[in-house]
A protein has these predicted regions:
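Catalytic nucleophile-loop/oxyanion-hole region of alpha/beta-hydrolase
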Residues: 44-59
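Extracellular, luminal, or virion-exposed ectodomains of exported proteins
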Residues: 13, 19-21, 30-35, 56, ...
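Loop/turn elements at helix/coil->beta-strand transitions in domains of secreted/extracellular proteins
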Residues: 1, 7, 34-40, 70-75, ...
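Serine-dependent carboxylesterase/thioesterase catalytic core
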Residues: 55-183, 203-247
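Active-site loop/turn elements of alpha/beta-hydrolase fold enzymes
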Residues: 37, 42-46, 111
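Extended ligand-binding clefts on enzyme/binding-domain cores
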Residues: 90, 189-198, 203-205
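Terminal low-complexity/disordered tails
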Residues: 215-364
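Short, surface-exposed "cap/lid" segments of acyl-processing enzymes
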Residues: 1-41
Length: 364
């Protein structure tokens, strides 16, 4: 069994990946071993690199596992978050190009098959901070890091709505549409392979109770006086006011997006090694606190990152009705899927989802 790491910046940390799978709520790796599976964890030199580039690494891994295995057992191949898209594309490309991936089952864990979400207000604030303080001695690198992650090759391919700069309009990036065309060119899915998937969000239509059009983060100091970031709503909306003291305020406007922050889905992952474990709005608050020397007002740390309909490939995330409806198995492009009983952190290994995977892998 091969499972690929997901999106982040920098090199994969195999110890952290292992720890999250084995030493949390459910000892997933031990349970796989008890069921007779060998597990290969696939990492990447740069997790924010292009999905297509990292798929080349996945293909090398699949070929090596086939060459090194004992016997002729078929493989299970998949991944967490972006890792599911990397391996999905890798398997489809291998088949399209005449290769033999010898894979019986594909598995994705909270993978954004239909796209991921990062609030436009948060994206704009990250770019605003980089533009104004990115060269600050001692802090510029840290203050610019969130913006650089948002503008990485993988983020442009994953996010359903993306902005490259404060002044840009929210839309699918060209890198995403190009990737989707390439995925379609190689067949979209590997034929003849059973598709399994799990979502860290609910499948009942029950959201996370985060309301639309409310302020999630507000600054309290003197450097960013008047800056606020709001949750997303439908229709035309000012989702953020960005203000550097002494300069004109910059309103950030969106139009035609769904109220997606509160939708059923896996929540934006928290950073466990940073104070307060910041997530999406939480990271914006952390950056504001660094600039102002006092904490920002944070109402919501994490909102939806991978909607459930995306994780189980059941609908597009710009379909507001689908976002908040019970998921019909007939709508999914997966053969079998499991949604969490409550909305939880993106790619968190739970007993509910882990046990379902282990059971399904033992069922033809």
């Amino acid at each position: 069994m091969i499972l690929a790491d997901g999106f982040s910046s920098g090199k994969s940390d195999p110890d952290a990946l292992w720890n999250g799978l084995e030493n949390g709520e459910y000892p997933f790796i031990s349970k796989l071993r008890e069921a007779g599976f060998d597990l290969v964890l696939l990492g990447f030199e740069e997790r924010s690199a292009s999905i297509i580039d990292n798929a080349d690494v996945a293909i090398e891994c699949i070929e090596k596992v086939i060459a090194d295995r004992e016997g002729s057992a078929k493989l299970t191949v998949g991944g967490f978050s972006m890792g599911g898209l990397v391996t999905r594309y890798a398997l489809a490309k291998m088949h399209h190009d005449g290769g033999d991936h010898q894979t019986a089952t594909f598995l994705s864990y909270d993978t954004p098959h239909s796209g991921a979400w990062l609030p436009i207000s948060v994206q704009a604030f990250a770019h605003f901070v980089k533009d104004n303080w990115g060269t600050l001695p001692g802090f510029g690198e840290l203050l610019s890091s969130f913006s650089r992650m948002i503008n990485s090759a993988a983020a442009k391919q994953l996010l359903r709505w993306h902005i490259e700069s404060v002044s840009a309009q929210a839309q699918q990036h060209r890198a995403r549409t190009d990737f989707l065309k390439e995925l379609k060119r190689v067949g979209s899915w590997p034929p003849g392979v059973r598709r399994l998937g799990v979502a860290n969000g609910t499948g009942t239509g029950a959201g996370n109770n985060i309301p639309a059009r409310v302020t999630a983060m507000r600054t309290t100091g003197t450097e960013l006086t008047g800056t606020r970031l709001d949750t997303q709503d439908t229709g035309e909306q000012i989702v953020a006011i960005l203000k550097k003291t002494g300069s004109p305020e910059i309103p950030i406007t969106t139009n035609g997006l769904p109220d997606i922050d509160g939708a059923p889905g896996g929540l934006f992952p928290e950073a466990p090694n940073l104070p307060g474990r910041p997530a999406n709005f939480g990271t914006a608050a952390m950056l504001a606190g660094l600039l102002e020397g006092e904490p920002a007002e944070l109402t919501y740390n994490a909102t939806t990152f991978v909607p459930s309909v995306s994780a189980v490939a059941a609908a597009e995330v710009d379909d507001r009705d689908a976002l908040y409806s019970k998921i019909d198995p007939a709508d999914s492009e997966l053969d079998h899927f499991m949604c969490a009983s409550e909305n939880q952190g993106h790619t968190v290994m739970t007993e509910e989802l882990g046990r379902w995977i282990v059971d399904k892998l033992q069922t033809p």
